[in-house]
Amino acid sequence: SFGVSQLPDDILQVYKPLLKRFNKILIREVTGKTLLHTQLGLDSQVVLDPTFLLSRSQWEKMANYPLSKQQKYILSFQIINRDVHYDAMLDYLHRKLGYEVIELKDSFRYKPWKWPIYAKAGPKEFLGLIKNAEMVVTNSFHATVFSILFHRSFFCSRNSFGFNSRMENLTGGLGLADRMFDSSTFLHSISDTDVVYEKVDEILEAKISATKQIIEKTFAK
């Protein structure tokens, strides 16, 4: 996975001889497949991120729930610095839905603390916080993945650094392109806060089946 749609020339010179050593390349985004073909002349196949190859119930068994299951909250998790419009967007969702906002961060050093911060989450708590949220707002690929697996309402914020392609491919490929937004225009472009997962699950099940077949065929050789 590259996370971008184009690589600079200096990186290409490093990647090309190394990638040519592989018999087969599997990649988790369509833009990555295009990048490999157009910039490096290499063929690849698109598969799902491995997290999708475990079922929802398998992930649920691993989850810990650090907050009360009765508590209703919007979970905010940003792995890349937010822009100036992000807090206004969270405030809008807080007022619209009436739920508290919980910020998932790696420490308490972030200031000002507009919302309550949860800074003690390991992998199990990460799963539980997403599973129990009424809504997830994030720019994290895997927070998006688990929001989908756990059937959470969610929004993905684009970042100004350009690392958006893998989330755009993920949401677009599942019919969830309207979940992607720019925080500067969010208030003017917000779609329904709920996600209808029936169709999403149909698409996802087909992609999971195809991914497993590709992996099995690859390792059978």
What does each model-found stretch correspond to?
Residues 1-221:
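Active-site anion-handling motifs in enzyme catalytic cores
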